[in-house]
């Protein structure tokens, strides 16, 4: 166990109050211990890591596994409530909410499987492909802003932050325009936390759709990422049908949700800091630095995805035992005063090298350049087109999503005039 008495959290985490204002609570946890056990709303015990130095090191630590074949078993052992444990075992059995096919991707794998998957995906998801999307993203954003201009008041999440990343993912996967309405419904259900049976049916429907889509790309390739993934080889290997489906779903959830939140959180930061808006209006070359600061200040992910200790792991003066679930708090680490001076201030001039909003190590997000590109293009066009846009409600009236992983707004009501 720990070198000293095992730390514990006296705070009531994962409540509506926490999701609304997490940073003060996370600061208290960061001061008390580098890692401490907490309990999630579904009764799962996990070790929360809150300091930057330890967080960055653990993101790249090979002693922490992400292989869900191991993870599901370990998760079942880490429930503090037997009733919750029984419910988990039932839900991960024959009636699993998320079929196994959805977890055979590189985010939930370790080397050598991860190495093979990332090499194959990396050959198709190139910097040239990302750069080629710029004119299309610019045109799409301009079209959506034309719609925003028609209304005095609008929800910026629904009108802009959601449709741009969703449409870009549809371009990458090659989802035809006529199928995007139902594809969006499935996507919303997958990330909504809605009733289990409804989500499970959406998974089944999406898997069936993607199998058919992949077959069509195999027979008649298009100029999209999914077609390239179907036909890409490395050392004579290809992605299997299940791996292709899982990768498409990973793009949809990880590649889409994070960008939605980057746009929404970045816009809110600028509404609340007009002096930064003025800086960007007078010097557009500052936008890349601004995006890095948005990722630090209120990034799109509160926590990294689950990891599991394969042996005892020291975190500062605490030792996490083998077989434990570990949650790395990206939000807490990003505001560690040992890393950043005045971390609670928005400062687009600060040095954000070494940022971990998109992870670190072998699991660093392959789609990070695309997310940054979308965030920069959408936000710069938004505030160029609407320099006087402002919040329609007080900041404390905004509602944040109750998510253990995502940090994003439910709505962002604004006034255009």
What are these regions (language model features)?
Residues 1-417:
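Cytochrome P450
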């Amino acid at each position: 166990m720990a070198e000293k008495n095992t730390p514990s959290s006296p705070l009531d985490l994962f409540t509506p109050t926490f999701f609304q204002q997490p940073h003060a609570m996370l600061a208290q946890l960061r001061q008390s211990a580098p890692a401490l056990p907490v309990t999630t709303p579904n009764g799962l015990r996990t070790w929360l890591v809150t300091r930057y130095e330890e967080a960055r090191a653990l993101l790249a630590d090979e002693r922490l596994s992400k292989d869900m074949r191991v993870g599901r078993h370990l998760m079942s052992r880490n429930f503090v409530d037997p009733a919750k444990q029984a419910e988990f075992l039932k839900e991960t059995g024959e009636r699993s909410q998320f079929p196994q096919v959805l977890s055979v991707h590189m985010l939930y794998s370790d080397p050598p499987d991860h190495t093979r998957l990332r090499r194959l995906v990396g050959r198709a998801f190139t910097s040239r492909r990302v750069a080629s999307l710029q004119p299309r993203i610019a045109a799409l954003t301009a079209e959506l802003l034309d719609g925003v201009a028609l209304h005095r008041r609008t929800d910026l999440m629904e009108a802009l932050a959601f449709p741009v990343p969703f449409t870009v993912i549809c371009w990458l996967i090659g989802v035809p325009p006529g199928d995007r309405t139902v594809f969006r419904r499935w996507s919303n259900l997958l990330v909504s936390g809605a009733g289990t049976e409804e989500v499970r049916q959406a998974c089944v429907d999406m898997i069936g759709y993607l199998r058919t889509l992949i077959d069509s790309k195999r027979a008649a390739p298009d100029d999209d990422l999914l077609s390239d993934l179907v036909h890409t080889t490395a050392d004579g290997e290809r992605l299997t049908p299940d791996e292709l489906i899982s990768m498409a779903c990973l793009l949809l959830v990880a590649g889409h949700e994070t960008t939605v939140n980057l746009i929404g959180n970045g816009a809110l930061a600028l509404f609340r800091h007009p002096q930064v808006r003025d800086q960007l209006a007078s010097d557009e070359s500052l936008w890349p630095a601004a995006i890095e600061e948005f990722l630090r200040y209120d990034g799109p992910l509160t926590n990294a995805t689950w990891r599991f200790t394969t042996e005892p792991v020291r975190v500062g003066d605490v030792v996490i035992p083998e077989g434990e679930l570990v949650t790395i708090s990206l939000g807490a680490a990003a505001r560690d005063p040992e890393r950043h001076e005045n971390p609670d201030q928005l400062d687009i001039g600060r040095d954000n090298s070494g940022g971990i909003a998109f992870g670190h190590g072998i699991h660093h997000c392959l789609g990070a350049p695309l997310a940054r590109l979308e965030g920069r293009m959408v936000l710069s066009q938004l505030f160029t087109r609407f320099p006087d846009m402002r919040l329609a409600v007080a900041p404390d009236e905004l509602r944040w999503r109750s998510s253990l992983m995502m940090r994003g707004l439910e709505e962002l009501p604004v006034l255009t005039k």
